[in-house]
Amino acid sequence: MEKTKDEVIKEILTLFILAFLAVIIICPLGLLIAKSFQNNGGEFIGFKNFHEYFTNPNTLISLKNTLFISTISSIISIVLAFTFAYGIQRTTIKFKNIFKYIGMLPLFAPTMMHGIALVYMFGRKGAVTTGFFEKLPALAWDINLYGPTGIIIAEVLYIFPQVFLVLNIALSVTDYRLYEAADMLGTSNFRKFFTITLPNIKYGFISSFIIAFILTFTDFGAPKVVGGNYSVLATDVYIKVVGQNNMAMGAVVSIILLIPSVIAFLIDQKVQKKQSVVFNAKSKVYVPKKDNLRDTFYYIYMTLICLFVISVFVTIFVSAFSKLWPYDLTFSLKNFKFYDYNGGVALFFKNSFILALLSGILGTFMTFMSAYLIEKKEKKTIADKMIYFLSIVPLALPGMLSLIHI
């Protein structure tokens, strides 16, 4: 059967997008993998780099530390975010939008900023550590920030919004008819929670854990700022490449860093397919009932979460406009004088804005075209499946990983 003009155009666009994704994703990863089997001179040496890495006890400690930080941070963030999302979806408290927007604030800041704020708050000369600069000594609290404690706090703050978004959606689409049937049978709230609520959002829990794990596992900013001497894989990559100029070993660490992320991401994709068949058009939206004791608890809990988030941003804001934090808190704009640094802050902002704008336009266009071409076809071709896979692969990749080969 002869193809129509529209079908020919769609095939051409599909091949173009596939070629584009191959250039920006497959080629860098291919070069990265090839580099891991070479020495710094470019000679093929097989698995020697991997053997050297795994026989070094110090490098194995980094892997162990990374797995520990990722697991603990993911569990804590899920507990906090689920409780927060439950307060949004299953209570009758007021100001839900305010709580939600404040809880989402960390999403718009890098983990490096979170780490810097924590240093100003809980570092050796931090506001909380010194009892608010010895004005409230009774409130002084040293949490021993530098190391796993600081990394976990910074990572939880970073991944909290992403986990909250997933769990908030999962709770919002639970079928209310199940609760109505349970009420008719006289089921207690405790039993409804464990037999209806949790089973219905189990895929949300799995997805949120995997997202949190990947983001933490591949993050560089928080360990760099508050990690101290506590090594993780992301900082190992930086040390190998920038500090030691050992590109081959940096590629090895990058591959090791990539494997758990890809496995976790593939599991997440399988989970999402199962999640899509749980709900249907006949599902009813959950309608929470009034409960003063429950609502009071969530008012307190969500206020505490929001106060901590606000304190992080306020600390950064105040320190930026202070003459010399924490010794001289006099208002000053001298910290914004970048005129001696390669053109000044205007040039920095201009370059960042242009890069973000171009990336946003190109990324949005390519993503829309890819989604349109794939979803508008009744039968998916091999090219369509490859486009889908290559489009989601970057979500499982560390930010710096694809650039190691350069």
Over which residues does each language-model region extend?
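Transmembrane helix boundary and interhelical loop/hinge segments in multi-pass membrane proteins
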Residues: E43-G46, L167-E180, N189, K202, ...
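Helix-loop-helix hairpin linking two adjacent transmembrane segments in secondary transporters
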Residues: T235-P260
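Glycine-rich helix-loop "coupling/hinge" segments at transmembrane-helix boundaries
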Residues: F220-Q244, P326-L329
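Feature of multi-pass inner-membrane transport and sensor proteins
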Residues: R191, G228-A234, I263-T296, Y327
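Glycine/proline-centered hinge or cleavage motifs at structural transition points of membrane proteins
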Residues: L185-T187, P199
